[in-house]
């Protein structure tokens, strides 16, 4: 089953959504559709400047189709939760954790975040928006990682 997700031009543009199959979005990430900007983000040492650069990336809402970029504008849940794992001290640790996560039966996809210092992990869940937070909390317990971003 192909899930449809929502993209916005960037984090500031929240009114004009684009809807695409998740596999198309993942393929574009894999192919490096924004690789030049990602390289600039990863090279930038100043956190404020890096955050400004990140505002130029497309904003992806993996959890479903939305009319706008807020929870109340959910049209249909995709059956996907995007988890963030952050705070890795060393690149080797990040890569090792990514490899381990991809072996987990719940993980649909895992990739290095645009900053290069974290991971984005997609997990399939029932497409039930009423239980989205419950699934998130259960996944936090399942992965039991100090790098799991609880926000």
Model-derived features: positions:
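Residues in well-ordered beta-strands of folded domains
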Residues: 84, 111, 122
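A generic structural motif
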Residues: 117-124
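DNA replication initiation modules
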Residues: 2-15, 67-90, 125-151
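Hydrophobic, Leu/Ile/Phe/Ala-enriched alpha-helical segments that form helix-helix packing faces
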Residues: 45-48, 101-105, 139-147
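Short beta-strand
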Residues: 109-115, 150-151
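Short amphipathic alpha-helix segments
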Residues: 88-106
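Beta-strand-rich binding-surface signature
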Residues: 80, 104, 118
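DNA replication initiation on ssDNA origins
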Residues: 1-79
């Amino acid at each position: 089953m192909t899930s449809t997700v929502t993209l916005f031009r960037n984090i500031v543009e929240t009114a004009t959504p684009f809807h695409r199959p998740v596999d198309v979005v993942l393929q574009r990430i894999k192919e490096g559709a924004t690789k030049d900007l990602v390289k600039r983000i990863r090279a930038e040492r100043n956190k404020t400047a890096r955050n400004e650069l990140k505002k130029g990336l497309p904003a992806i809402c993996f959890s479903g189709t939305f009319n706008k970029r807020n929870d109340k504008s959910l049209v249909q849940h995709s059956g996907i939760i995007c988890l963030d794992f952050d705070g890795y001290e060393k690149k080797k640790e990040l890569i090792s954790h990514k490899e381990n996560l991809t072996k987990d039966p719940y993980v649909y996809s895992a990739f290095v975040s645009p900053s290069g210092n974290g991971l984005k992990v997609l997990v399939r869940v029932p497409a039930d928006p009423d239980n989205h937070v419950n699934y998130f909390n259960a996944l936090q317990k399942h992965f039991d990682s100090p790098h799991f971003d609880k926000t």
